[in-house]
Amino acid sequence: MGPIGAEADENQTVEEMKVEQYGPQTTPRGELVPDPEPELIDSTKLIEVQVVLILAYCSIILLGVIGNSLVIHVVIKFKSMRTVTNFFIANLAVADLLVNTLCLPFTLTYTLMGEWKMGPVLCHLVPYAQGLAVQVSTITLTVIALDRHRCIVYHLESKISKRISFLIIGLAWGISALLASPLAIFREYSLIEIIPDFEIVACTEKWPGEEKSIYGTVYSLSSLLILYVLPLGIISFSYTRIWSKLKNHVSPGAANDHYHQRRQKTTKMLVCVVVVFAVSWLPLHAFQLAVDIDSQVLDLKEYKLIFTVFHIIAMCSTFANPLLYGWMNSNYRKAFLSAFRCEQRLDAIHSEVSVTFKAKKNLEVRKNSGPNDSFTEATNV
């Protein structure tokens, strides 16, 4: 019931697992049997569907690894990119990179094979790492929204220091590690007998108490509220107030108008990141909630395929974020180009910003120093 993982195999009935394992015409012993009813066939066992799933997962992995690695690289390499907001964005990229490397390959393997082939240790570690990475992403997006809200709406002159930002990032990982710990603790690596003399290996959740323990449902619902509903509420409130503030704010002077445009672009970029995350994860969260409320959802003919499709949609957020940074933010776009050209300084591609303009800008800023200074600086990424 964690945020990601192939739960379809863990909740199937014996009859469903039989159909998946042996296909339409043979038993484990190679005996011919009558064709099963069409509605019992699992679509994820069809070669055409498997090819599509492999292409989809591999594309997401490739785009996610390249994009998120590039975000991390430019923040580390270029000193001008080492701002508090960019540290949070880089932390988001680290979490997404972990999802690309720890979630997708194992989930795809589990989906295609129909049983757990990675051993007992990874049975406990993989779901934990998956939950940890997703929760860090959610908390980081919330932190970014609160940081922008603090600086822009309240005009606070005291900015968060880099040391404090690292402390916040550490807390995000610590809280996520604690919240994801049940995914590693309440796990069972076991053999399940499908028919006499035939068993498969399964990696399933094992909560204390009776077979259908309420603890699993409570954990799943709590995760939905704490790591999806509540963050989305906070993020939506923060960005609504930011949008209202930017809409009503008027900056004097040409230089401040330039910064006002940058503020708007930055806010749009961050809002798009949040919207992409929310929309991409909504189908999977809603589907898992439906399973918790009504277990008959597990009896759907295409439960496994539906789960896999929603999982793919959720994973698209891991490569969408770097695309948003590159497309909507000029700083990242220039940093990406500079990284591809193997340039050592980001300033080398700031050709449109002349020394004369910089001097003029500094002079205007000094003349217009006042309450708006903190407002201007706070919105630059």
UniProtKB/Swiss-Prot annotation:
It comes from Homo sapiens. Residues 73-86, 146-165, 238-268, 326-381 are cytoplasmic. InterPro entries: GPCR_Rhodpsn, GPCR_Rhodpsn_7TM, NPY2_rcpt, NPY_rcpt. It is found in: Cell membrane. PROSITE patterns: G_PROTEIN_RECEP_F1_1, G_PROTEIN_RECEP_F1_2. High levels in amygdala, corpus callosum, hippocampus and subthalamic nucleus. Also detectable in caudate nucleus, hypothalamus and substantia nigra. Disulfide bonds join C123-C203. The chain crosses the membrane at residues 52-72, 87-107, 125-145, 166-186, 217-237, 269-289, 305-325. Residues 1-51, 108-124, 187-216, 290-304 are extracellular. This is Neuropeptide Y receptor type 2. One of its GO terms (biological process) is negative regulation of secretion.
